[in-house]
Amino acid sequence: MIDKVYCADVKPEMEGKRVKLAGWVYRKREVGKKVFIVLRDSSGIVQVVFSKELNEEAYREAKKLGIESSVIIEGTVKADPRAPTGAEVQADKLQVIQNVDFFPITKDASPEFLLDVRHLHLRSPKVASIMKVKGTLMQAAREWLLQDGWYEVFPPILVTGAVEGGSTLFKLKYFDKTAYLSQSAQLYLEAAIFGLEKVWSLTPSFRAEKSRTRRHLTEFWHLELEAAWMDLWDIMKVEEELVSYMVQRTLELRRSEIETFRKDLTTLKNAVPPFPRISYDEAIDILQSKGVEIEWGEDMGADEERVLTEEFEAPFFVYGYPKHIKAFYMKEDPEDPRKVLAADMLAPEGYGEIIGGSQREDNYDKLIQRILEEGMDPKDYEWYLDLRKYGSVPHSGFGLGLERLVAWVLKLDHVRWATLFPRTPSRLYP
């Protein structure tokens, strides 16, 4: 019995070995009395050659194959430097699982068409590489979090209130009540720290924002951490150590996939602690010196962040934001009541914010005051306020947008390419 091998396992040093391959026809061409097929599977590609002399029946069947036909092939490995992997398989057996007459995706397909047929586009080797990198980033995150003593928890997706502002909630009927899709697991993670101290979760988060920028999705994967006994500076240290490990480990394991998208790895290699830190005040000064029209107290959007990232060749922090542009749960800066103890991590090369974090307000009365200042009803947050009544402690946390991190690592032009089936204001299908 012949062992099945993956396409990427076929190497020149296997010359003369008989192998079985299963996969899909990625490319096909005919030269004389030979049919050359580039076969793909989840591991990569390999060239397979059918010749009339070796097996006329298999050769005739190979001539009929269309792109994306599924096949099982047997043959002998031959070293050939002209082949994509330095070796090819000279096939003498062909089992056609399904022949495809016409595959709708062509080389000149537009981005919008590729999204329309995303269920078919996923089989592209480039898309597969993106998903491998994304999976490896999370594999690395889990490794680091386990080593550092964090507990994974599993918060709800159906919730009763807002975390990041009521105008961006997706509303739905929950029996005889109103529920919403979660914007963030943060409030629930805060509850979990009183038993587990250091917790994290990976969940989908939903934002009903009609933003059509290259870094917004209405559904995205959210890596969130929350820890008791940590202040802002402690949690920033956690952020940089985690992101650095994720990036360096993925560079180690997925370098070839990354180099498919970017040749210059400088900024990734530079993602080593300590990351640069600048205050919001300094950020405004930098932007104004570059001719950006922005005043102290205004939030920085994608355009402002893009200009700011030109100053750095590694991820960096901006801390000390004005209170009125940040969320109600952030702790007021005791040295400047106009500000909160918050910090964002920005990726270089124009990618901007990938993490938002802060020290949380742990005082019951001050938290109620902030809720009222934001025009919200404390009754909607009774259980959350309870956390400040029974053994409240200093604590901090952050959320990382996984697709944004992937987009920076691979230099993608839009976060929609970093998720399996992107959800945007104009796209819910497939």
Swiss-Prot record:
Gene3D superfamilies: Bira Bifunctional Protein, Domain 2, Nucleic acid-binding proteins. PROSITE patterns: AA_TRNA_LIGASE_II. GO terms for biological process: asparaginyl-tRNA aminoacylation. The keyword Iron does not apply. It is an enzyme of class 6 (ligase). GO terms for cellular component: cytoplasm. It catalyses: tRNA(Asn) + L-asparagine + ATP = L-asparaginyl-tRNA(Asn) + AMP + diphosphate + H(+). One of its GO terms (molecular function) is ATP binding. Its EC number is 6.1.1.22. Keywords: Aminoacyl-tRNA synthetase, ATP-binding, Cytoplasm, Ligase, Nucleotide-binding, Protein biosynthesis. It comes from the Archaea. It is found in: Cytoplasm. Belongs to the class-II aminoacyl-tRNA synthetase family. This is Asparagine--tRNA ligase. It comes from Thermococcus gammatolerans (strain DSM 15229 / JCM 11827 / EJ3).
